[in-house]
Amino acid sequence: MAAGWWFWCVSVTVAVALLIVCDVPSVSAQRKKEMVLSEKVCQLMEWTNKRPVIRMNGDKFRRLVKAPPRNYSVIVMFTALQLHRQCVVCKQADEEFQILANSWRYSSAFTNRIFFAMVDFDEGSDVFQMLNMNSAPTFINFPAKGKPKRGDTYELQVRGFSAEQIARWIADRTDVNIRVIRPPNYAGPLMLGLLLAVIGGLVYLRRSNMEFLFNKTGWAFAALCFVLAMTSGQMWNHIRGPPYAHKNPHTGHVNYIHGSSQAQFVAETHIVLLFNGGVTLGMVLLCEAATSDMDIGKRKIMCVAGIGLVVLFFSWMLSIFRSKYHGYPYSFLMS
């Protein structure tokens, strides 16, 4: 009986000793992991205090963004800002990204849950190769846990690159709400004041004859310009802030027409406005040819010119529509 009791006590003692010995390495590893994480967060906070958008090369990206442990998200902009890259969109996107990062850095809700970083192609081309990335600018959210999913890549062509749009995307992916605070822009008020001054000056100079205020042609032209601007998508550009065009960094080919019906470029707005203006001018010439008191020869020329403008520009407009709405069955002169 005593031997059995002695054997049981020895067994329990050995088991407890083994548990203690095995637990020591795990505790040590956990402590080391916490120290590494603390060092990474402190380093990122130090850089963020100096510059809200942290510039990273390949080594920094792999150590601070890709390698565990990590309890923070990193919003990374992959870009090409060097002058010889001739990426106009990259410059515009960088300005919006800086505004967003500054808004977060100086917000009362600022924490170490999320950081902003950028990788320039000329400083971290190995990162572009590692991620199989062939276009810039590109925004990717690297979450605190796991790998980036499909939704963690920002749809630049659809949403545009305005700071407000990127902030909404970040809120969807990280639950961090950023209130965008833009630096004051006095260009708008100055232009409005200048316009009012010009109008006031004209009214003052023509105060003895105010018939120009009742000129139907002038009001019709102003209304037509407003309609052309609105129907071309100018308001969509103002809200979404899309790029002017897209240049392929490998081939150098520039796209002025977006291939999707859900987005557009600024250049596309100008093209559509020009085509609508051409159709309108053609219709005006046709109306003048039918109602004018000019000789028959000039009226025939106006009629032919009007028909030509309507046919040509409407055909171009329809071809753009077909390129954006794939499967649209109708065309006119041009496919």
Swiss-Prot record:
InterPro entries reported for this sequence: OligosaccharylTrfase_OST3/OST6 (IPR021149), Thioredoxin-like_sf (IPR036249)
Superkingdom per UniProt: Eukaryota
Membrane topology according to the record: Multi-pass membrane protein
Domain Thioredoxin: 47-175
Segments on the Extracellular face: 30-184, 231-270, 322-335
Key words, A-Z: Cell membrane, Disulfide bond, Endoplasmic reticulum, Glycoprotein, Magnesium, Membrane, Signal, Transmembrane, Transmembrane helix, Transport
Subcellular location: Cell membrane; Endoplasmic reticulum; Endoplasmic reticulum membrane
Residues with attached carbohydrate: 71
Membrane spanning stretches: 185-205, 210-230, 271-291, 301-321
Disulfide bond sites: 87-90
Stated role: Accessory component of the STT3B-containing form of the N-oligosaccharyl transferase (OST) complex which catalyzes the transfer of a high mannose oligosaccharide from a lipid-linked oligosaccharide donor to an asparagine residue within an Asn-X-Ser/Thr consensus motif in nascent polypeptide chains. Involved in N-glycosylation of STT3B-dependent substrates. Specifically required for the glycosylation of a subset of acceptor sites that are near cysteine residues; in this function seems to act redundantly with TUSC3.
Protein name: Dolichyl-diphosphooligosaccharide--protein glycosyltransferase subunit MAGT1
Organism: Pongo abelii
Gene: MAGT1
